[in-house]
């Protein structure tokens, strides 16, 4: 596997791809209106007034979402700190600045809803790019620019760097397990225990691709826009993009179309993708990775530089490398959980959505807090869903 996120600039210094200038200018957003003014003190007072009604949040207003994400990006304490006091202190600033730009005065609940949906979609797409598509860092960045909201929440990747590094570590473990399975199967074939080679199992990889449960929005669309009517369905991708930046389509472990409309791109997203190859490719864009194949030889130990430090108030014990044996045992236990979940889903299909949400909520809760016991976890989940 390749290094996670650095780009050589011709000197010893490297810059993460996500911190390079955008390949093309971002779409313009409404500027602040000097005739609109709303003090944060007044906003805080209204927030405490139960009778005051804030403006409704239109889940289909994409410009509003982008403005909110853009304003949150100007308040690092919201996205780089786990201090709830610091976070809540800055939301009134985001609300009043959003009002100056859109004329809409949103509640803190609506602002947090927009922010959570943006973060969840960002992580989902990163997981698809890193784990399912197994792209290089440059290809991950090009892939992310296909999403029209990426430029307005790109800053959050400062916070996801450790998480992205952990994804790659887990991927290395899975690839090593698959290679060892293939090696053992070949040994059994050679000894006559098996009549023909068995293909590597992909179940462990599938488990790694569980999507985060987004904040539910009726009618909301955070997906890539649908294709323009003039675009021919028979047009080949090669006619639109440089060959070096065509994303792999065959032999994918995970199909992102189950969650997003990724197979189509608007003209603006195509422009982002082409411009990225021209600006960041340096005349020789990294080649698209071929689907991973395995020989009978054990996989070599992966070598990767440690991720660069990020501003994050998290105990270092959270990122202590786990012994391989412990991870292997956990993987086997997850196989059993997956089997039982699928069995229940088949027996009770009408409760599939509820089952999926429950599983996501439990797993993703550990991204938000370091739990000492199961009781705390269940209390938080009960409060969240009450």
From Swiss-Prot:
Q: Which N-terminal stretch is annotated as signal sequence?
A: none
| GO biological processes | negative regulation of vulval development
Q: What results from changing residue 20 to P?
A: In n111; multivulva phenotype in a lin-15B n2245, lin-52 n771, lin-9 n112, lin-35 n745 or lin-37 n758 mutant background. Increased lin-3 mRNA levels in a lin-35 n745 mutant background as compared to wild-type
Record note on quaternary structure: Interacts with lin-35 (via C-terminus).
Q: What is this protein called?
A: Protein lin-8
Q: Identify the tissues in which this protein is expressed.
A: Widely expressed throughout development, with particularly prominent expression in the germline and in neuronal nuclei of the head (at protein level).
Task: Extract the InterPro entries matched here.
Answer: LIN-8
Task: Sum up the protein's function in the record's words.
Answer: Acts as a synthetic multivulva class A (synMuvA) protein and redundantly inhibits lin-3/EGF expression to prevent inappropriate vulva induction.
**Swiss-Prot/TrEMBL keywords:** Developmental protein, Nucleus
Swapping residue 154 to C leads to an effect described as: In n2378; multivulva phenotype in a lin-15B n2245, lin-52 n771 or lin-36 n766 mutant background
GO cellular component terms, semicolon-separated: nucleus
- The transmembrane residues are none
Q: What happens when the gene is disrupted?
A: Temperature-sensitive multivulva phenotype in a lin-15B n2245 or lin-52 n771 mutant background.
Q: What Pfam families does its record include?
A: Lin-8
- Which stretches of sequence are listed as region Sufficient for interaction with lin-35? 175-285
Spans annotated as Disordered: 212-240
Comp. bias regions, Low complexity? 229-240
Localization (cell): Nucleus
The source organism is Caenorhabditis elegans
Record-stated family: Belongs to the lin-8 family.
